[in-house]
């Protein structure tokens, strides 16, 4: 078995595109191999800032031979009245590259067996340039020279080897060969690869660690070694550290870790500022002592060896200190003003030209937060703190620190609020109102912060809808889907049952023209769509998600989420099919008549009507006392047998109008309760 090597040599690829490009190369190669029926063993990917590559191990000598049976016209159409092959038969044979003499007659049709012989591997692999390399798609492109061809970065060289043999093809004017490039500074410019299997070893001798996972492991090991030697605590398990490790891994080919320091005086600045300066701006890893206190040291990685490392450390320290000087200055200067001073400036800050200022947005948020607090029965202390938080929660946008480090908005608001004498609940809410900051980010823990976060996001959704700035397709420039997801996740995490429909209706009526033109049902549907998306992401069946969200009534997000989960949990019950069949039969019949809930037991004609009536009366009591969708499902499931018996013995559409309407009224009562679980007709019975 042979080994194939493909390497695409590039100018430096942005760090955030390297890993996804490597994955895409593997995926497209798998599709290519499947399309050409060429079997291989393992596929080993490689990537650095300057190259995307892969090795195909155990490549078959040729593609799999293929025999396909093709059915032609019927025997009757295949021959004319003289028994000769018809034009239809001859055309079919010609289209398959055969003659009618190769026909077989079977099952009333003529058949051809088409044999495709295997194609040598080197012949197939010569097409990988056109079918894989040239077809790669990226979120960022460049053009170079006079080519109209677009790629993530200009291609500078190509290597394609099947064992020792060069597989010839071109991409633009770049021909494949066996010459790669080593490290830009530590190696000679051109490095020859003798054999496809020698790729990784050859590059390592040229100061390139091509295996991204191996390179990352080495970086992690080097960082931990330095931290342990100095008795520092280095945390690499949290998401930001993992992201930084991935970024650093994708900007180096030969990693060498080192440590640096800064003056202890800068530790007077909040930790978040120092960490942001180190991690976000300089790609440094911060360290703490065993008590959790931030230390005046950092760890970093250079793309090179240990030569002149002292100069590298000094240069990095100098750049960091310049950042910290700015941070210290802004931190000191910001405290010279009061919150009222910053709020005066917020009044001039534009939220959106079609909507108004940030200050006006805050006023609406305060009103909506008050209505949400009423719905949640907040006590007076919480309401007071919520009102104060809503009054000032964007003040830090006008501080010098947030102007310099915009990713610290909310974080600095919390710090400054404490320094300016605001209580803990208000200060915490200022930071938490941005949460969650990502699809899977943390939810606000405090009740005041969570309500402020919900109100802030809902006002944005309503006002942007009113301004007809509604997301379409994948286009969502104002992050409204993310905001709606945050609303859903906050409500479900806190398990807050809030009927959004009446709350938002009252809010929109009170806030006038800026929200009046918003379509309330469109807004609610938009938020409920996020419930659907989150449920589908949890691998819940599409039909169950649809059933649970189609009828969202007052838009109690927690109840919608609960009933989706309840239906999903019971979908594996032995009697689920029977329960859903019985309930949907009731629903379909009830939909055919105007709703009437006046049932006269005196008009019952058989025992099954009486039994169903008694069971339904019990169900109504259970539904009134039920604490969630689970109790309602259990109560409705208990009706399955009475419903089945009822339909076995009872004809609903009888001639007697009085009896017929009485029976429909009984079904309508049950259907109103069924609607509490959603539109069960959406469920596919398996």
UniProtKB/Swiss-Prot annotation:
Q: Which N-terminal stretch is annotated as signal sequence?
A: none
What biological-process terms (Gene Ontology) are attached?
glycyl-tRNA aminoacylation
Q: Decide whether keyword Nucleotide-binding is in the record.
A: yes
Query: Cellular location of this protein?
Result: Cytoplasm
Swiss-Prot/TrEMBL catalytic activity:
tRNA(Gly) + glycine + ATP = glycyl-tRNA(Gly) + AMP + diphosphate
A GO MF annotation of the entry reads:
ATP binding
Superkingdom to which the source organism belongs: Bacteria
Gene Ontology CC: cytosol
Tell me its EC number(s), please. 6.1.1.14
- Keyword presence, Secreted: no
Basic and acidic residues bias (residue ranges)? 67-84
Give the UniProt keywords, A-Z.
Aminoacyl-tRNA synthetase, ATP-binding, Cytoplasm, Ligase, Nucleotide-binding, Protein biosynthesis
Q: What class of enzyme is it?
A: ligase
Q: Which residue ranges traverse the bilayer?
A: none
Q: Residue ranges of region Disordered?
A: 65-99
Instruction: Give the family per the record.
Output: Belongs to the class-II aminoacyl-tRNA synthetase family.
* Subunit composition and interactions: Tetramer of two alpha and two beta subunits.
Q: Which HAMAP family match?
A: Gly_tRNA_synth_beta
Q: What protein does this entry describe?
A: Glycine--tRNA ligase beta subunit
Q: What is the lineage of its organism?
A: Bacteria, Bacillati, Bacillota, Bacilli, Lactobacillales
């Amino acid at each position: 078995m042979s080994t194939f090597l493909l390497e695409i040599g590039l100018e430096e690829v942005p760090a955030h595109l390297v890993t996804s490009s490597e994955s895409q190369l593997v995926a497209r190669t798998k599709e290519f191999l499947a399309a050409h029926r060429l079997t291989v063993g393992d596929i080993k990917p490689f990537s650095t800032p300057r190259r995307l590559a892969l090795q195909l191990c155990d490549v078959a000598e040729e593609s799999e031979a293929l025999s396909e049976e093709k059915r032609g016209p019927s025997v009757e159409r295949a021959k004319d009245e003289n028994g000769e092959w018809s034009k239809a038969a001859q055309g079919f044979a010609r289209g398959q590259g055969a003659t009618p003499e190769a026909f077989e007659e079977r099952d009333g049709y003529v058949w051809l067996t088409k044999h495709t012989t295997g194609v040598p591997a080197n012949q197939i692999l010569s097409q990988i340039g056109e079918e894989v390399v040239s077809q790669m798609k990226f979120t960022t492109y460049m053009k170079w020279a006079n080519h109209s061809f677009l790629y993530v970065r200009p291609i500078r060289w190509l290597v394609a080897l099947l064992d020792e043999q060069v597989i010839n093809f071109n991409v633009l004017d770049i021909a494949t060969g066996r010459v790669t490039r080593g490290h830009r500074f530590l190696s000679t410019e051109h490095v020859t690869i003798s054999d496809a299997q020698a790729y990784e070893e050859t590059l390592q001798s040229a100061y390139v660690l091509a295996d991204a996972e191996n390179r990352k492991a080495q970086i992690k090991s080097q960082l931990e070694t330095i931290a342990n030697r100095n008795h520092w605590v280095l945390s690499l398990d949290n998401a930001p550290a993992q992201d930084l490790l991935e970024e650093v891994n994708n900007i180096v080919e030969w990693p060498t870790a080192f440590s640096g320091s800064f003056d202890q005086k800068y530790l007077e600045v909040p930790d978040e500022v120092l960490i942001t300066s180190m991690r976000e701006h300089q790609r440094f890893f911060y360290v703490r002592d065993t008590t959790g206190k931030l230390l005046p040291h950092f760890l970093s990685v250079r793309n090179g060896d240990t030569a002149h490392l002292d100069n590298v450390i000094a240069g990095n320290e100098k750049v960091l200190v310049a950042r910290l000087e700015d941070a210290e200055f802004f931190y000191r200067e910001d405290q010279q003003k009061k919150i009222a001073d910053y709020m005066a400036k917020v009044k001039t800050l534009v939220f959106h030209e079609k909507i108004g200022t940030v200050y006006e947005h805050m006023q609406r948020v305060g009103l909506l937060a008050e209505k949400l607090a009423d719905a949640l029965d907040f006590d007076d202390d919480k309401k007071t703190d919520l009102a104060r938080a809503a009054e000032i929660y964007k003040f830090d946008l006008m501080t010098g620190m947030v102007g310099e480090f915009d990713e610290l908005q909310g974080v600095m608001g919390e710090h400054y609020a404490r320094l300016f004498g605001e209580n803990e609940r208000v200060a915490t809410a200022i930071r938490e109102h941005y949460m969650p900051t990502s699809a899977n980010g943390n939810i606000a823990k405090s009740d005041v912060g969570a309500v402020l976060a919900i109100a802030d996001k809902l006002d944005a959704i309503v006002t942007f809808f009113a301004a007809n700035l509604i997301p379409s397709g994948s286009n969502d420039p104002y992050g409204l889907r993310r905001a709606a997801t945050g609303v859903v996740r906050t409500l479900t995490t806190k398990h807050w049952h809030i009927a959004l429909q009446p709350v938002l209706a009252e809010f929109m009526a009170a806030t006038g023209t800026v929200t009046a033109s918003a379509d309330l049902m469109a807004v609610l549907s938009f938020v409920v769509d996020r419930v659907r998306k989150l449920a589908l992401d949890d691998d819940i069946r599409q039909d169950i998600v649809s059933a649970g969200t189609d009828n969202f009534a007052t838009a109690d997000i927690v109840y919608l989420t609960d009933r989706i989960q309840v239906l999903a949990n019971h979908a594996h019950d032995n009697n689920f099919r029977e329960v859903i069949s019985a309930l949907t039969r009731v629903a379909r019949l009830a939909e055919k008549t105007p709703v009437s809930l006046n049932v006269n037991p005196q008009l019952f004609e058989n025992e099954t009507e009486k039994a169903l009536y008694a069971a339904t009366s019990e169900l109504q009591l259970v539904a009134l006392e039920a604490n969630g969708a689970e109790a309602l499902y259990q109560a409705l499931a208990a009706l399955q047998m009475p419903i089945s018996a009822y339909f076995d013995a009872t004809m609903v559409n009888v001639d007697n109008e009085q009896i017929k309407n009485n029976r429909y009224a009984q079904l309508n009562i049950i259907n109103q309760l069924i609607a509490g679980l959603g539109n069960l007709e959406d469920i596919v019975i398996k």
